[in-house]
């Protein structure tokens, strides 16, 4: 039996539309996946998802296992109540919607993500603490 051919699209997550400087896994990503399905596509090929280092290339990451914090949805963090829309909109992510200003992104987004982490109280969660303990033991 012959295998059925399938097709897909290569689109870096960073290329998704966003008012916060870079595309991420938010509502726009879900809409893109829905559009792919509607168009009969089977695959969404994305570039590596690791954090970028100098040069901001997805192929030059300083971690094999970590995810890129730029792809965390600020809109979801607003919904969760750990950031406000005003805080996110007060950050300068650059003015060119067709390219990513990584210097501004690094400065602004990391401050917001730190605030969200501190407000989340995840470090007080017993399941998270058990996870940390298991990682320390191994």
Task: For the regions a language model picked out, list residue spans one by one.
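Acidic/aromatic-lined carbohydrate-recognition and catalytic surfaces
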Residues: 2-138
